């Protein structure tokens, strides 16, 4: 009899636990993580491919013809800096290159452990996919020039909620 009661209690507890969990219904992209360890809520391989396809073919940024440049590689330190900034913008509901604590992109990149010679940052809000955010950045002259800069050798990016951050850099 006691065994039945314990079994019934376990069964009811299991059902109650599962029914109290809220399923995440937000639209998140898959997270292939080619280099490793930073969970960025973006499809890193897709972002890297879209950026490098553009860099390798060249493009027009505003009225400036940008010739083909070498591809960039993924960097987890840059991705970590991007994640910090996207999280900050999302949690404090603002949109700016300046962090809520007054930090610049260079400050955040340095804090993530990346020793840079040059860096650039792109931010966006509201784009539903990796392709949409890259397309948006490429239609903005300044963002496009960041992506196409021959001085940029590595990148990392992250999305939190509807806030995207891309960090580009070279050491």
Segments and roles (model prediction):
Residues 1-18:
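Sec-dependent bacterial lipoprotein signal peptides
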Residues 4-6, 56, 144:
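Hydrophobic alpha-helical segments, especially transmembrane helices
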Residues 13-42:
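Bacterial Sec-dependent N-terminal signal peptides
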Residues 20, 59-61, 144:
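Disulfide-bonded cysteines in secreted/extracellular proteins and peptides
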Residues 76-129, 147:
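Short, surface-exposed glycine/acidic/tryptophan-bearing loops
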Residues 116, 120-171:
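Disulfide-stabilized extracellular recognition modules
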